[in-house]
Regions:
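Contiguous alpha-helical scaffold segments within structured protein domains
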Residues: 4-92
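Conserved hydrophobic core element of enzyme catalytic domains
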Residues: 56-163
């Protein structure tokens, strides 16, 4: 059987958000790795939601380790924006709360230097019999605040069902 990855019909805004992140990661990796490979964007299901995913891989040179690579990439536009320095300064000035566990990376780290990492976009912290859900939404010039809010609520339902 031939398995094909398909990008289901996604709104243009969602595809642009994915491309911002892909372009950023590829441009950063191209400065420190060789043979960067990028898949076509495709759709994956997580809980009840569909997401756009792009696989990106490369081989680190002798002078680059995983810690340096993460420092180079984090935060990605998925959680900060572009251009990164301007977006980060805006967030620091206007957001008004500690993002705590909202973002970071997670995945497999192994001694064979073949790691498989993901940007953490949603998570939950349970502390003192309280659950705190962390999620966000992609804000672009084409964003509709009502739709973004509904998207965040829908994203939270996946974790809320666990509780």
């Amino acid at each position: 059987l031939e398995f094909r990855r398909v990008l289901f019909r996604s709104p243009q805004k969602e595809q642009e958000e994915q491309q911002f992140v892909t372009d950023y990661i590829v441009s950063k990796l191209n400065t420190v790795t060789t043979a960067v490979q990028v898949s076509a964007a495709y759709s994956v299901k997580a809980g009840s939601l569909w997401h756009i995913k792009t696989d990106i891989s490369g081989a680190f040179g002798a002078k680059l380790n995983l810690k340096k690579a993460i420092q180079l990439l984090h935060p990605t536009p998925a959680v900060c924006g572009v251009p990164k320095e301007i977006a980060k300064a805006f967030i620091d000035t206007h957001e008004g709360y500690d993002r705590s566990f909202y973002t970071g990376f997670l995945g497999e780290l192994n001694r064979d230097f073949a790691s498989d990492l993901f940007v953490n976009l949603r998570c939950m912290q349970i502390e003192n019999n309280q659950a705190h859900l962390y999620m966000g939404c992609g804000i672009t010039k084409d964003s509709d605040s009502e739709k973004e809010w509904k998207e965040s609520v829908n994203k939270s339902m996946i974790m809320k069902r666990i509780l």
